[in-house]
């Protein structure tokens, strides 16, 4: 509890009217969809055989939305490249955080489940195991070679079918 005056004092100041965390302008790469419009759309006319998707660390706090968002992105990219069966290889989040950080580790485990759900429920998608390569103190595992081999084997196996 507390008085409305006290709560108002504790609230962080509002950003100025018109403030945006993104660079202004239609070509700003850091605005929402900026990377898509400035990079991906430009390579769409070229041949692509598959996509290795290694992302998700920054979405752990919104993990309940992740499966739907990634599924929509996969459908959109397949449409953009005009390849309805474009393979997607989803790299599982590596294990991360100290064994003592039970809440954080639980959140990462739930995120891995969301990634697996996407691979299980979307055609021509695969999950590339990575949870065994993580380190408690580094969000980006040092063992890139093993992960690279797994990704290559998965892609080659799909490509050779």
Write out the residue ranges for each language-model feature.
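Cell-envelope and extracellular/periplasmic
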Residues: 1-161
């Amino acid at each position: 509890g507390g008085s409305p005056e006290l709560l108002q004092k504790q609230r962080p100041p509002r950003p100025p009217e018109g403030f945006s965390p993104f660079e202004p302008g239609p070509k700003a790469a850091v605005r929402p969809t900026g990377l898509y419009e400035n990079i991906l759309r430009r390579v769409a006319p070229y041949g692509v055989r598959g996509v290795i998707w290694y992302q998700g660390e920054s979405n752990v706090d919104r993990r309940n939305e992740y499966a739907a968002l990634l599924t929509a992105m996969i459908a959109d990219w397949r449409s953009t490249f005009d390849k309805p069966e474009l393979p997607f290889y989803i790299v599982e989040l590596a294990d991360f955080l100290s064994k003592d950080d039970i809440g954080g580790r639980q959140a990462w485990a739930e995120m891995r489940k969301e990634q697996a759900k996407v691979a299980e429920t979307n055609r021509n998608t695969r999950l590339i195991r990575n949870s065994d390569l993580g380190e408690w103190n580094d969000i980006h595992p040092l063992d890139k070679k093993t992960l690279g081999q797994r990704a290559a084997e998965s892609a080659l196996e799909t490509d050779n079918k």
